[in-house]
Design a protein with these regions (language model features):
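Flexible, solvent-exposed loop/hinge segments and secondary-structure transition points
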Residues: 1-127
Length: 127
């Protein structure tokens, strides 16, 4: 499956979950270099959620971690604190970003923004 097809499948699953939860979101899928493959904002999702979803996807693709797992690592004095400080806002350490792996290798990053963390899942899946 090519990356665009994978991105469309992921976006459809995210939107279905968000629709069921009645929480409009934005979703972004990027390749391993951080280039946008797909962006989608559901009607009613906050306008800023599109940008945040891209930052979350970018971070997950390049750092290869869930963005929620970065939170303790980017605090002052911690190992990845400089990453956030010098990135010009490009990286995100808020929940909602995951990397996608195929055959053990990261192929994309996915970011979801606009929903409440407890409602919309961004589980990493092997494709």
């Amino acid at each position: 499956m090519d990356l665009l097809t994978l991105a469309k499948n992921v976006a459809q699953r995210v939107e279905a979950q968000a629709t069921q939860a009645k929480v409009p979101v934005a979703v972004c899928v990027v390749d391993v270099h951080g280039n946008v493959v797909l962006q989608h904002r559901m009607p009613g999702a906050p306008l800023f959620s599109l940008e945040l979803s891209e930052r979350k996807a970018y971070t997950s693709a390049l750092v290869r971690l869930r963005t929620a797992d970065l939170v303790p690592l980017v605090q002052p004095g911690q190992a990845l604190y400089p990453l956030i400080m010098v990135s010009g806002g490009r990286y995100s350490a808020m929940g909602g970003g995951v990397s996608l792996a195929r055959e053990g290798e990261v192929v994309a990053g996915v970011g979801v923004s606009g929903g409440r963390r407890s409602r919309i899942s961004t589980s990493s899946k092997r494709q």
